[in-house]
Regions:
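Conserved "HGTGT" condensation-loop signature of ketosynthase/thiolase-family condensing enzymes
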Residues: 1-122, 130-136, 142-268
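Short-chain dehydrogenase/reductase
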Residues: 125
């Protein structure tokens, strides 16, 4: 079965490296209590939904490592005091961010969090095929943050792990509003995978997935090497949507943690 197309009703993002003012958009009640990665996800979603006629009915979040800073703080507490803060623990759980977003934006339908390294965004888009028509529109958020500790740890990791974390300094939150209906005048997106390597090279499997998506249609395929950071795929999608460049772009990804590949296709 061919992966389902979803219409992209809207999109927005927070890229801290190029958006110094984004923190001014965090509500005071969130700024006091919630971790930075939640702030990134909230602002990206709030920008997207600012002019939405009604709140989404479901959501899917893709994140590779979740709230890294909260995980660090929880482990610091155990190391220094013998116990970790319950607040840090709750925030460090990957799907707690999706729950918080659902409460803030009054999303009372299905709520999924997908965690598979570089495939997390593709997994989130693909998971929308599980939702019934009554669960649309769907808010999809891809988000990962960077903390200094990761760069400090890289020299002490095995070479394979270090190689796949070397681009983890890139951070962003990208939000999409998807409709199950195919609306011709809107961009569309779909995803395939993740699919296990099963002895194949990542580049070979990525080409197979791309071929299954475009099925002979003229398309541009992003090199899998371009998708090394956890937010590479959603950022490439966001840049394509922002540029309004017409045509089909396929972005394959490979997650060394699951030894699987996925691919996302956007059409304008």
């Amino acid at each position: 079965m061919s992966p389902r197309h979803f219409s992209v009703r809207g999109f927005n993002a927070v890229v801290p490296a190029s958006d110094s003012a984004w923190q001014a958009e965090i509500p005071a009640h969130l700024k006091r209590r919630d971790p930075r990665i939640w702030h990134m996800a909230y602002v990206a979603a709030a920008r997207l939904l600012k002019n939405a006629a009604e709140p989404p009915r479901s959501m899917a979040v893709g994140t590779a490592l979740g709230a890294l800073d909260e995980t660090k703080n929880f482990l610091d507490g155990i190391f220094k005091d013998g116990f970790g803060s319950p607040k840090n623990f709750i925030a460090s759980v990957h799907n707690s961010m999706a729950g918080k977003l659902a409460l803030e934006f009054k999303i009372d339908g299905p709520n999924l969090t997908l965690c598979d390294g570089q495939n997390s965004f593709a997994s989130a888009v693909a998971s929308c095929t599980l939702f019934p028509s009554s669960a649309f529109t769907c808010l999809v958020v891809a988000v990962d943050e960077s903390i200094p500790l990761v760069n400090e740890l890289i020299p002490h990791l095995p070479p394979v792990c270090a190689a796949h974390l070397s681009d983890s300094g890139q951070e962003a939150a990208v939000a999409l509003l998807l409709d199950r209906r195919v609306i011709p005048e809107l961009p569309s997106i779909r995803a395939i995978g993740p699919i296990a390597l099963a002895g194949k090279e990542p580049s070979a499997l990525a080409k197979e997935l791309a071929a299954r998506l475009h099925n002979g249609a003229a398309s541009s395929i992003s090199p899998i090497e371009k998708c090394r950071s956890f937010v590479s795929a959603p950022l490439q999608i966001y840049e394509r949507l922002t540029s309004k460049q017409t045509g089909i772009l396929i972005i394959p990804s490979y997650s060394p943690s699951s030894k699987a590949c996925a691919a996302v296709e956007v059409s304008l």
